[in-house]
């Protein structure tokens, strides 16, 4: 769990993914379309993959990936991110991390 907490607070927006996950890719594209360059951790390339998955689930993710953190706080998985986006609540949350040059 410590590793996940450390990794999730490295940058403003952090997404834990797996390289074969299409929903992970969709969430990454959403953030890029919103002018945010998230830090991506592909956990299937990490030797601690299983432990990271377990930690993400313990933190409250409905699925281990994608797991989105903003400002070091868990936002959630695909359902939570898309719900925030559709309700208009995602952009204010990520505003400090948007790039004007992106």
Swiss-Prot record:
GO CC terms in record: cytoplasm; nucleus
InterPro entries membership: GlrX-like_pln_2, Glutaredoxin, Glutaredoxin_subgr, Thioredoxin-like_sf
Domain of life assignment: Eukaryota
Disulfide bridges in this chain: 21-24
Domain Glutaredoxin: 1-101
PROSITE patterns in UniProt: GLUTAREDOXIN_2
Family, per entry: Belongs to the glutaredoxin family. CC-type subfamily.
Protein name: Glutaredoxin-C13
């Amino acid at each position: 769990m410590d590793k996940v907490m450390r990794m999730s607070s490295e940058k403003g927006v952090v997404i834990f993914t797996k390289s074969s996950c299409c929903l992970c890719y969709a969430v990454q594209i959403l953030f890029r379309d919103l002018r945010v360059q998230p830090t991506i951790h592909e956990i299937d390339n990490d030797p601690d993959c299983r432990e990271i998955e377990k930690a993400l689930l313990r933190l409250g993710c409905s699925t281990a990936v994608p797991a989105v953190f903003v400002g070091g706080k868990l936002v959630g998985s695909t359902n939570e991110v898309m719900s925030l986006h559709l309700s208009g609540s995602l952009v204010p949350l990520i505003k400090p991390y948007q790039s004007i040059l992106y």
